[in-house]
From Swiss-Prot:
Gene Ontology biological-process annotations: DNA-templated DNA replication; double-strand break repair; viral DNA genome replication
Name assigned to this protein: DNA polymerase
Recorded catalytic activity of this chain's protein: DNA(n) + a 2'-deoxyribonucleoside 5'-triphosphate = DNA(n+1) + diphosphate
Keyword Ubl conjugation in record: no
Enzyme Commission number(s): 2.7.7.7, 3.1.11.-
């Protein structure tokens, strides 16, 4: 089939990074400036739309033809911009995203990084960023530039010619990447899933604009009150200024090294001065960012009061899970206020003082209501349904831990059952408030992926009333009760090392296969999808005096570098990737059944359904349907119907 490779350069007064491509294209001044393209291996051509050129007829026809595959690096950007600029309906199924393809092979997410990692002869033009700043975003009006707010080609013809060369080069690099990685074709099911993901992002989710506006206004009023009180107590012109406040506190006899969050708590404990105490508390309150997500919603809002582009396909490259974008729906505060209706109505009614009187701290209330800003379309309601304890089910199934599978096939109370297994007591004797259940819960949350004492502490074991001295015994008890999971960690690590060392496939249960090809360690999942670890190496781990696996990937700093891994970490990736594949199949099944997904968060789907259909049972049944490649995996889903998004 014919392929059309595309790269475009655009202008919009809306900030692309903060607002996303959908709101970006809705700006009245949005336009495509340059359109570079190439059919198959033909030379790259450029169309200067900004200076009156028009797109050739064959390109316009190809854009909507099912006989031409359109490719781009970050295809969502090109597809969305081209659809808007030319007023075309561009079906995601006809597009391929080279960025997604590269990410599935464990390569960096950006064009420049992939080209370098693959050592291509075609490399991204480094001058591009400066040219984009000059032509693609508004400029500051000055005397020197005649107070203009935008740079046009005639303002610097030489730069404009360089911009065209840059755009052409991006097509060359994208095409070179595509050709290099073409032998590792993604599964057809993954392409269909990407197309569905694009449809979900195109659909977007409706926002309660009234709630968002009131949340921002409420926070402004609350912050103004805090600053006014702090000014009164300190006499400072700006008590929010670190330098001013530090000087004032030193004058009060305190020794200040820093005003960081943890240091303020120390200062509060070390002062008997009530005024200083209150000022420090005010400082803490002023630092809380309860409206960050509301502001993100406001920036990303499209004219129809929907936000789009909230989910990044394959955003988590180790597992293939989605990542949150813009509002970061994967990382929303949980609901701890029971009466959300009252809190929402008070906020939307402008009763800000009543909120403080009823619920206490305003930032806490506003953070509690963030989820509820997502609302169904007019005349609809949300069905929110999620898999029950899916990671715990998947690891039990993969490892063959029979007693756990029995729990999930019967009562499903894994915390109680885990405690009963660990401490050799009847499961009936462990009630919800029981200390043993608490131990079972923290052990389940912390220890499944080879975690030890440190993992328990990180999971909050000490805050749950457990003593540090009893943690090693808890680890031992859990591992003794879950011998097959422990064995699975070591089997997976050994299989990965053997595959890299011997360059031969190593097979484990449920079709799990480790294989080394073209400088990549692949882990084939039960679904047939592969996880990729680029440029794996075996190195001596001096801490444990044994061989360990390392690979190239994204460091915590965001830079590209070498990472260590081990059995438990590989198992975590495999389990989360398998859970992701279960969700993927479910999203496809829900779509085939006519349901419109507007969001999905981890293992939960949010559907926008006409009011009164009463089909929640049907949705839960679809989510609980067996999966052909996961025989014996017990899947169940729980859901609820709501007029706004929340955690049940």
């Amino acid at each position: 089939m014919k392929t059309l490779s595309i790269d475009i350069e655009t202008f919009s007064s809306v900030d692309l990074l903060k607002a996303g491509v959908y709101a970006y294209t809705e700006a009245p001044d949005f336009e495509i400036l340059l359109f570079a393209y190439a059919f198959d291996d033909d030379p790259v051509k450029i169309i200067d739309l900004a200076q009156g050129d028009t797109l050739p007829h064959e390109v316009l026809v190809a854009l909507t033809s099912s006989k031409v595959i359109k490719t781009a690096y970050n295809a969502n950007f090109e597809r969305t911009c081209i659809a808007k600029h030319f007023n075309l309906m561009l079906l995601p199924a006809q597009w391929r995203c080279t960025a997604v393809h590269a990410t599935t092979l464990g390569l960096p997410g950006n064009l420049d990084g992939v080209a370098k990692a693959l050592k291509l002869s075609a490399q991204k033009d480094k001058a591009g960023k400066a040219l984009i700043r000059y032509f693609s975003v508004p400029c500051k009006p000055t005397k020197a530039n005649g107070q203009r707010v935008r740079n046009l080609p005639e303002h610097d013809p030489e730069k404009w010619e360089k911009f065209k060369v840059y755009c052409i080069q991006d097509v060359e690099v994208e095409r070179a990447i595509k050709n290099r990685i073409s032998k590792f074709e993604p599964l057809e099911s993954e392409h269909k899933l990407w197309a569905l993901d694009q449809e979900i992002n195109d659909r977007g989710v409706r926002i309660d604009v009234d709630l968002v506006k009131h949340a921002i206004a409420c926070d402004e009023q609350y912050q103004a009150g805090l600053i006014a009180e702090a000014k009164k107590l300190t006499g400072l012109p700006n008590p929010n200024s670190t330098a001013q406040l530090k000087k004032w506190l030193e004058e009060k006899g305190l020794t200040i090294s820093s005003l960081a969050k943890d240091k303020i708590e120390e200062l509060i404990e070390n002062t008997n001065d009530e005024t200083v105490h209150r000022v420090l508390r005010l400082r803490q309150e002023m630092a809380k960012t309860s409206v960050k997500k509301y502001l993100a919603m406001e920036k990303a809002l499209c004219p129809d009061n929907r936000v789009r582009g909230l989910l990044q396909f394959y955003g988590a490259s180790r597992t293939g899970r989605w990542a949150g974008r813009l509002v970061q729906v994967q990382n929303l505060p949980q609901n701890k206020i029971e009466d959300l209706d009252t809190a929402r109505n008070l906020l939307k009614g402008g009763h800000y003082e009543a909120i403080e009187l009823l619920y206490g701290q305003v930032p806490f209330v506003l953070s509690q209501l963030v989820r509820t800003a997502f609302i169904p379309s007019e005349g609809n309601e949300f069905y929110v349904s999620d898999f029950s304890a899916i990671e715990a089910r998947v690891i039990a199934w993969l490892a063959g831990e029979e007693w756990r599978l029995e729990v999930f096939n019967t009562h499903g109370k894994i915390y109680e059952a885990s405690a009963a297994q660990m401490f050799k007591v009847p499961v009936e004797s462990i009630t919800k408030g029981s200390p043993l259940r608490q131990k079972g819960k923290v052990a389940e949350l912390a220890l499944g992926y080879q975690g030890g004492k440190g993992a328990l502490i990180q999971m909050g074991a000490l805050n749950m009333g457990l003593a540090e001295g009893e943690l090693p015994e808890l680890v031992k008890a859990w591992r003794t009760a879950n011998k097959k999971i422990v064995k699975f960690w070591y089997d997976v690590e050994a299989a990965a090392i053997k595959a890299v060392k011997e360059r031969k496939p190593v097979k484990l249960q449920h079709g799990l296969t480790f294989l080394y090809e073209s400088g990549i360690l692949f882990v084939q999942l039960p679904s047939g999808r592969r996880l990729a670890y680029a440029k794996p190496k075996l190195e001596l781990d001096e801490r444990f005096g044994k061989e360990a696996l390392t690979y190239e990937g994204k460091l915590e700093s965001g830079k590209w570098g070498r990472l260590n891994t081990y059995g438990g970490k590989l198992v975590e990736n495999i389990v989360q990737a398998t859970a992701r594949d279960c969700l993927a199949i479910t999203l496809m099944r829900l779509d085939n059944a006519g349901y419109k997904t507007v969001m999905h968060v981890h293992d939960e789907a949010v559907l926008d359904v006409p009011r009164g259909k009463n089909e929640l049972d049907k949705v839960e049944a679809i989510m609980g349907e067996p999966i052909s490649w996961a025989k014996g995996l017990p899947l169940t889903a729980d859901g609820f119907v709501t007029d706004y998004y929340k955690k049940d």
